[in-house]
Amino acid sequence: MTFLGYPPAEHLLGDLGMAAEITSETTARVRTRATPQIASADGGVRAGVLATLVDVVGGAIAARVLRPDWMATADLALEVVGPVPGPWVEARGSLLRRGRTTLVVEALVVGVDEDGNDLVVDGRAPDPVAWASMTFAVLPTQDASSGGRPSPELPTRWAFSGGGLDLPVLEALPVTVLDGPAGRLSIPARPYLHNSFGAVQGGVVALLAEAAGAEALGAAQGRDASDMVVTDLQIAYLALAKVGPIVSSARVLATGTDGRAGAVVELHDAGAGHRLTTVVNVTAVPAEHFDPTVV
């Protein structure tokens, strides 16, 4: 099933198998199954996939609140405070503010069962394992009749159905490593990765930035990228990435005593005059040092 005609039949969101529910006029939740194909070095769902999840839940809320106007993601911040093992992982979003030109959504990420029920550990539901916020730019419509009316019946449910991932998500994009220590990676701008504007989807951008940061930060510590867990993403979306390939570069910042380090990742659209499309602050830590109590 699609939401407002998006995504197409063959698309990453469908292969991630996301199930969504608009729970009120200003809240929604979206979940996906935690599989080895989307796992990070800590065994939990990787930060780029969590960013994709919260981008979708934020977009679902914004689309309902703003219709007939539309929106584009301006920035997204994600903080992961512990491994996200599943069996399903769910982003629960709520509207924080609607202004004339921007809209802000907050999301908490929790582990749930297949029906979306909280997992119970020692008689209580666990605390959220990640937090995110998103700012959307409001795009006024030129045709007030074009957006239709949202369904008055709540909750509204739908699912993005696809064939599933039979290989790691970075290979499915696919990500090509050009120069790991420099954080130079690339992905094509193909329909499988597009958003509703025909540009690379915001969650895919997060996945590329996560991978680029892990490559550069791992190399700076004499480690492989697969040893690093990305815990924080702060993403500024500056321009649409439409032509491709989309190429990243990374500048490594200081490293803490526990191996925690940061990098600034920039993404450029090589086919559009190397236009700067995205800037991302990435924080990562070696998997063996990922202690949720100190994140």
Set out the residue ranges of the language-model regions.
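Terminal targeting signals and extreme-terminal segments of soluble enzymes
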Residues: 1-295
